[in-house]
Regions:
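Accessory, non-ATPase domains that flank or precede helicase/AAA+ motor cores in DNA-metabolism machines
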Residues: 1-354, 371-385, 668, 702-734
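Well-ordered beta-strand positions enriched in small/hydrophobic/aromatic, beta-favoring residues
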Residues: 11, 92-95, 123, 390, ...
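A short catalytic or substrate-binding loop motif that flags glycine-/basic-rich loops and adjacent residues
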Residues: 17, 433, 686
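A general secondary-structure junction signal
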Residues: 27-29, 77, 177-179, 430-432, ...
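Short helix/strand-capping connector loops at secondary-structure junctions
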Residues: 38, 689-690
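Inter-lobe coupling/hinge segments of SF2-like helicase ATPases
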Residues: 192-198, 202, 206, 214-655, ...
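A carboxyl-terminal module marker
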Residues: 663, 667-688, 709, 727
């Protein structure tokens, strides 16, 4: 068995009396370990399921993000590769001729016998027609005798299961199961379908190629609808012409649905798709194909696609690089796909990374301004289509004058009416799902809260339930207030469900759809909603941040941002950055073809500089002001941030542990440590949470800093009082 163990193969190891775990052979050595070992009882793989570059990347993720390598292993591998019995190849029931019937004489005899059973005779004759038996000469080797899927034969012959079963039992047909792939590998490569670039796009592509000669990472900063995707397609073709593979990362699965069609139209079966909406078995097959002699040349996927094996990676594209969705939150490893993709490219000689966005993250923009990254700008929309008009509506004044109709201002309603009368489409953005963000007693002000978490419950009218968006727990809606027994319980605020309800009242003739987490849970839901809107089968699409991220809808002329204040008032140092990005991105969905779009931006904070900068499309001024603040108050990109979280069911215990942990950290980092403090949501899933912030200046010895943090955690957990405490680090939080 020792000879079978190689780097990258899976092995089975017994832990305890009855548990067996799948482990990965990471390194072969003869050093005596400092811990008790367990014997390997089975080597699962004949060939490695991981390659050297993956192992190195996983080790980097484990080290940089301070996460156990086992957590990286669990996050990276599809579940079907974690234990051999979890994955089963997909098979199809097929029939073929038994060996004793593969001659004209024996077939003639079989048909004669079957004349007494008319339906069996018809089904057997249909098999011979489908298999083109009459065209096969007597010299055809047995393995080339046609095999027909049972479903195909039964449909063609209109035969029941019983008829087919009788033919098999009487040995007129032979049944077997043929292994088939779950993946769609159809479609030819059509480079001639690639659209020619405009002069501005051509200049941008040339500049990217030129800067790739000196820089490994280039930031493409192009306004919305400037044609960045077409530049990506040209760069992908060049990489394929050079015999290289391409990884194309997108932040949302919804985007991969629309992008898949564009890329498949050109790259056909050379394109593979990888994200969490695929079944586990499909992801296993993609993984195995990437290890085969004929892997996909282009992989399009969400953040987990960085874990796939590549043998000749040449280009990584991170589209919408600013998106916080690229950062994994829970569970560990809490990696950022953008940083991980850059590190992945370093594992391959000559591989380059292109970051694309209309609204760069402060980290990427700062790296471009300081020369660490290359920088290319696209300042005009494709075909010189005008940027949308952004009209700010001060809802504070309108609410005071009682001119609002629910969440809708007169300006927005008028714009929607005009668009619909002109057979155009409307996009409405509300970044809260559910019907009402909270329910409140009109008499005493009681608000129902989650019993597990420190949050109010959201009312979902479609289920008639109150739901916690943190732990998922649901509660029936009370008939009366438990505090004062009043029956006047009112929904406060507007979720996407309530907006949809109001829009149906205001525009009863319009075809309306909603796109949020609740409507996209089922397989194919993303595709159906996007298809219907793209093809004009939907007039008004209401959505959360899912609709802000790079989707391309040609018929949209009006975008309504119902409440910009929820983004601006979030208690986080990135709130304005993310608000600018989201508002600019959703505005960019308007007027992407021939007609100038209109954006109605509703806010009670119309005078804020960030709102004015969104209206003017003035990213440079916004970034300059924000970077000055970040530098002054010691935030990224000038400082590294590490959040230390402590969680436990006993609030007093987590308080004392947090104080002690902060004290230990201050011994190493002095005034770089802030806290402990309660986060915005201080209890989740019955556990109280405390947070410590560590700010580390650029140039600090990060390996030593990580060592000090890890030692502080180890020392804390050695105290018996805190042995059951959960303590983890969030490096570079988003």
């Amino acid at each position: 068995m020792v000879a079978q163990v190689r780097m990258g193969v899976r092995v089975l190891v017994p832990l305890g009396r009855s548990k067996t775990y799948t482990a990965m052979a990471m390194r072969l050595h003869s050093d005596k370990p400092e811990f008790e070992t367990r014997p390997i009882i089975q080597v699962i793989d004949a060939e490695p399921v991981l390659i050297e570059q993956q192992l190195r990347l996983w080790q980097w993720i484990s080290t940089y993000y301070m996460s156990p390598i086992g957590d990286v292993f669990k996050a990276a591998l599809p579940a079907g590769l974690k234990a051999e019995e979890n994955y089963r190849p997909k098979t199809v029931r097929c029939v073929t001729l038994p060996a004793n019937l593969r001659s004209e004489q024996s077939l003639h005899m079989a048909l004669t016998i079957l004349k007494r059973a008319l339906k069996q005779h018809q089904t057997f004759s249909t098999y011979l027609q489908l298999s083109h038996w009459s065209e096969i000469d007597g010299e055809t080797p047995p393995e080339h005798i046609a095999e027909i899927a049972c479903d195909e034969l039964q449909n063609a012959a209109n035969a029941s299961d019983a008829v087919l079963r009788q033919l098999i039992q009487r040995n007129f047909l032979e049944l077997y199961h043929r292994e088939v792939g779950r993946l769609n590998t159809s479609g030819e490569y059509h480079p001639e379908r690639i659209q020619p670039l405009s002069p501005a796009q051509h200049a941008a592509e040339d500049s990217i190629q030129e800067q790739f000669n000196e820089k490994n990472v280039v930031l493409l900063h192009g306004v919305t609808s400037s044609g960045k995707t077409e530049i990506y397609i040209h760069l992908i073709k060049k990489a394929l012409d050079d015999g290289k593979q391409v990884l194309y990362l997108l932040p949302e699965i919804a985007l991969t649905v629309q992008m898949t069609r564009r890329l498949q139209n050109v790259f056909g079966s050379r394109l593979g798709i990888y994200h969490s909406k695929y079944s586990d078995a499909e992801r296993v097959e993609i993984w195995k194909k990437q290890l085969s002699s004929e892997p996909y040349d282009v992989i399009l996927g969400a953040r987990s696609a960085v874990f796939l094996p590549f043998t000749r990676l040449g280009l990584v594209i991170v589209d919408e690089e600013h998106e916080t969705s690229f950062k994994q939150q829970d569970p560990a490893p809490r990696y950022h796909a953008r940083s991980t993709a850059i590190m992945l490219a370093r594992m391959y000689e000559g591989a380059k990374v292109l970051l694309g966005t209309a609204t760069p993250s402060m980290e990427s923009y700062h790296n471009a301004c300081t020369g660490k990254y290359g920088y290319v700008q696209l300042t005009t929309r494709y075909k010189n289509v005008a940027m949308p008009e952004i009209r700010v509506v001060d809802t504070k004044d309108l609410y005071h004058r009682k001119m609002m109709r629910g969440a809708f201002s007169p300006d927005l309603l008028e714009a929607m009416r005009t668009a619909l009368s002109n057979k155009k489409q409307v996009l409405l953005f509300q970044n809260r799902r559910g019907f009402a963000p909270m329910v409140e007693c009109k008499v005493c002000g009681w608000v129902p809260k989650c019993k597990n978490c420190d949050v109010s419950l959201t009312y979902h009218r479609s289920m008639n339930m109150l739901t916690c968006h943190y732990c998922g727990y649901t509660y029936p809606v009370p008939k009366q207030c438990p505090n004062c027994e009043s029956t006047e319980l009112l929904g406060r605020g507007y979720g996407t469900e309530k907006i949809e309800d109001r829009v149906r009242e205001l525009f009863p003739e319009a075809r309306i759809a909603r796109m949020d987490l609740d409507t996209t849970r089922s397989a194919g839901a993303y595709g159906r909603i996007i298809d219907d809107f793209s093809c004009g089968r939907t007039d008004i699409l209401i959505g959360t941040q899912m609709i802000t991220k790079g989707l391309d809808f040609s018929g949209v002329t009006v975008v309504g941002i119902l409440n910009a204040d929820t983004m601006l008032n979030y208690p986080d140092f990135r709130a304005y950055e993310q608000a600018f990005q989201m508002l600019s991105q959703v505005s960019g969905r308007a007027g992407r073809r021939d007609e100038r779009g209109l954006v109605i931006l509703q806010t009670k904070s119309a005078d804020l500089p960030v709102i004015q900068q969104v209206v003017a499309g003035d990213f440079q001024t916004f970034a300059h002001d924000l970077l000055e603040e970040r530098s002054m108050f010691r935030y990224p990109p000038f400082y590294h941030l590490v959040y230390v979280y402590l969680r436990h069911r006993n609030e007093q215990l987590v308080d004392s542990a947090a104080i002690e942990m902060a004290s230990r950290l201050r011994q190493a980092f002095a005034d770089r440590v802030l806290g402990p403090d309660k986060p915005a949501v201080a209890r989740v899933k019955t556990e109280s949470i405390r947070k410590i912030v560590i700010k580390l200046e650029q140039g600090i010895n990060l390996p030593l800093a990580r060592q000090c943090m890890a030692e502080a955690r180890t020392q804390l957990l050695q105290d018996k009082r805190y042995a059951a405490m959960t303590v983890f680090f969030d490096v570079d939080p988003s």
